[in-house]
Amino acid sequence: SGDGSGKPKGIIKETPADGQAIESAAPGYADLIAAEAALPLAYENDAVWCMSKKTFMQYYGLVDETGQPLGRVNYGLAGKPERFLLGRPVVVCDYLPSFTSAISTGEVFAFLFNFKDYILNTNYAMGLKKYEDNATDDIVTKAIMIVDGKVVDKNSLVVIKKSA
């Protein structure tokens, strides 16, 4: 979620392509359908949903007109939850706000994206410094690395924002 000034530019700070920003007053089935429709066919293969766990649970609790749940949680071979919405994997993270009435109008709370379209640029040189802090007797390890990053193809990005 960085703004690109002194830190990598975050995915949700990128301006999506025309027609790829969906506005929603509350999580609903129509949001998911509109976002899926806005994702160009050429970018569909590796795109995943990204949202907070609380937002996922709001979508997960929705049912279609026949009473079938929209979300699916399966337990893979390792016993870890595997989350899906409309057949597409969901990555849950704490870096996006959960949908509540408290989030600001225009704030992104979920998005579809192919993470291969984000590039982290680095010189692969990490400086390590280890020293003892004499005031606290703690051993401190400090690592410094020069990195930058940004979305290189925003056509796979579809955001869902809170509407007024």
Cite the ranges covered by each PLM segment:
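Short, conserved, surface-exposed binding loops centered on an aromatic residue
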Residues: 37-42, 79-83
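Long, contiguous amphipathic alpha-helices that act as assembly "spine/axial" helices in icosahedral shell
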Residues: 1-16, 39-50, 54-56, 89-91, ...
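Extracytoplasmic/periplasmic cell wall- or extracellular glycan-interacting regions that localize
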Residues: 10, 24, 47-50, 59, ...
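Alpha-helix N-cap/loop-to-helix boundary motif
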Residues: 24-27, 31, 43, 51, ...
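Sequence/fold signature of self-assembling virion shell proteins
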Residues: 26-27, 65-164
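Short active-site loop/helix that positions an aromatic residue
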Residues: 56-66
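Alpha-helical scaffold segments that mediate packing/assembly in large oligomeric complexes
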Residues: 1-37, 159-164
